[in-house]
Amino acid sequence: MPTINQLIASPRVLQKSRKKVPALQQSPQKRGVCTRVYTTTPKKPNSALRKVAKVRLTNGFEVIGYIPGEGHNLQEHSVVMIRGGRVKDLPGVRYHILRGVLDTQGVKNRKQRRSKYGAKRPK
C-alpha cells in the first residue's frame, strides 16, 4: 500500500485493457489480400489439418485468418473479408475469413446454418 506522499509523486495509472482484435481498428470487418494459404495442426488434445490464410489488410496489418467450412477456393492474391473471432485450438489465429464474400465462395451442399457459410438456399 503506497503512502500519501508516494501517491502525490506518482498517481495511480489505469491499466489499459488488451484488445482482442486490434487489426480491425473498431470496424466490424476488414478487407485484405491473401499472402499465403496453408494448413496447420491444432493444440494438444485435438488433431486435424486446419485451413488458414495469412492476410495483408487494407490498413497494413498482416494477420492469420481461419477458413471455415469444408473445402475452399482461396489461393495467393485472393481478396477476402475478415471478421473477428479466434480459433481456440490454433494459437495466433484471431480472425475468421467470411465465406461467400468477395473472392471466397460459399460452402457447397450446405443445408443448415447456411448464412454463416455463404451458401444459397437449395431448391
From Swiss-Prot:
Stored Gene3D superfamilies: Nucleic acid-binding proteins
Protein known as: Small ribosomal subunit protein uS12
Listed GO MF terms: rRNA binding; structural constituent of ribosome; tRNA binding
Residue numbers bearing the 3-methylthioaspartic acid modification: D89
Assigned GO CC terms: small ribosomal subunit
Source species of the chain: Nitrobacter winogradskyi (strain ATCC 25391 / DSM 10237 / CIP 104748 / NCIMB 11846 / Nb-255)
Function in brief: With S4 and S5 plays an important role in translational accuracy. Interacts with and stabilizes bases of the 16S rRNA that are involved in tRNA selection in the A site and with the mRNA backbone. Located at the interface of the 30S and 50S subunits, it traverses the body of the 30S subunit contacting proteins on the other side and probably holding the rRNA structure together. The combined cluster of proteins S8, S12 and S17 appears to hold together the shoulder and platform of the 30S subunit.
Family (UniProt): Belongs to the universal ribosomal protein uS12 family.
Keyword Ribonucleoprotein applies: yes
A biological-process GO annotation: translation
InterPro entries hit by this protein: NA-bd_OB-fold, Ribosomal_uS12, Ribosomal_uS12_bac
SUPFAM superfamilies hit by this protein: Nucleic acid-binding proteins (SSF50249)
Complexes and interactors: Part of the 30S ribosomal subunit. Contacts proteins S8 and S17. May interact with IF1 in the 30S initiation complex.
